[in-house]
Amino acid sequence: MSIKEEAAKMKLASPLMASASAEKRNSALLHMIENLEAGKEKIFAANRIDLAAAKASGLPPAVMKRLAFDEGKLADSISGIRQLISLPDPVGKVTLARQLDEGLRLYRVTCPIGVIAMIFEARPDAMIQISSLAVKSGNCAILKGGKETKETNRVLFSILHEASTSANLPSEALFQAEQHSEIDELLTCRESVDLIIPRGSNTFVQHIMSRTNIPVMGHADGICHIYVDKDYDMAKAIPIVIDAKTQYTAACNAAETLLVHRDIAKDFLPVLEKAAGEKNIHLRGTKEAGEIIPLNIIENDDFRHEYLDLVLAVKIVSGVEEAIDHINRYGSHHTDAIITENINTAARFMQLVDSAGVYQNASTRFADGFRYGFGAEVGISTGKLHARGPVGLEGLLSYKYKLFGKGHIVEDYACHKKDFHFKEL
């Protein structure tokens, strides 16, 4: 059966999935946890095969790190599912209740989007995140992972699909597309697929966006900044910068650029250089920064580069206004932070930086659905429509309007036989 036919079947099954009870959906999530724990050795064995093949093909360390699925990532994935179970049912939530006239009541109610296609590179934990979020939110999900983790993805999908069906959810709730050739066909399934969420490199995401008329939610780059203001606290600044760069260098929310106020550069940069050296961080930057500490000189256009490695670009700026201008010009609208004790400067930075996440005195690595208490995330959206930032349950929901009347007709209001009497319920 072709991917187009599978998507059509899922579209027909999506109302059944949307109407499944919260108890049934949570039961499926519990089965996912049980199956993942019971099948972990099988998962790890499959992942070792993928890692060996990736190493033989010469994939870079940053990609290898994303490919790996170990005890730590399994534990994080299971924690995310447990958190999802603990969250209230997001489906059927009334967000507006209004009486339009006597006996005429309007309600706005949350509902699943329908059929979501998740196309991702490298990260096998994305398979677990999107499957669990889809089940909790009552959506059907088509999952297409990268060839680099085909063995891991195959085992994970088998485990997750069995958990879903064992809770009596529709068998069409989850589907795995395994062939690369299926992607182009999937991108044409406008009548069956409601949303595409790509996760991967800039080139990959741009490729998806340019080849489909289906709505796409996601981000193409993770060029995150930290600006150290003149009113900074050294005891906070250094640990934040080091954490944002090294806690997980291959993550899209890792810091790539450090902006430093000119007034404190001579005091701050030598301390940074020492801390960076201890963590094997390679510093690059402008000529002005290079006059204070040793680093490789780069040009302005190089600040558009996402390193995903132990590399940090450094630039000295005149103040918060230049920092804001640089971030909005060279950034990717993902997550950017300011280190300052001045609440007015922080407020201006957070108001004018055009990013999905703006932080004061905190690491950019906090930009994550699990750390936001969403349970898990399908990705981070840098767009402004529908969802922005880490996309959890709410980003996978739409809404519908339910109107209850007693024989009401518009003509009565058009000819002023009746008048609207709006009242919140």
Predicted regions and their residues:
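ALDH superfamily catalytic-core signature
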Residues: E121-D125, Q129-C140, V155, I159, ...
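Aldehyde/semialdehyde dehydrogenase
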Residues: E41, H180-R199, T203-H207, Y248-V358, ...
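Conserved small-residue-rich beta-alpha loop and adjacent elements
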Residues: S86, P90-E162, I214-V216
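A structured beta-alpha segment of the ubiquitous adenosine-cofactor-binding alpha/beta core
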Residues: D70, D101, R105-L106, L174-V193
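N-terminal Rossmann-like NAD(P)+-binding subdomain of aldehyde/semialdehyde dehydrogenases
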Residues: M1-R105, L133
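Solvent-exposed alpha-helices and their adjacent loops that cap or buttress functional pockets
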Residues: A97-R98, Y107-P112, V135, S166-P170, ...
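Residue-level signal for inorganic ion chemistry
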Residues: S21, R25, G138, I196, ...
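C-terminal core of ALDH-fold dehydrogenases
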Residues: S27, D325-L425
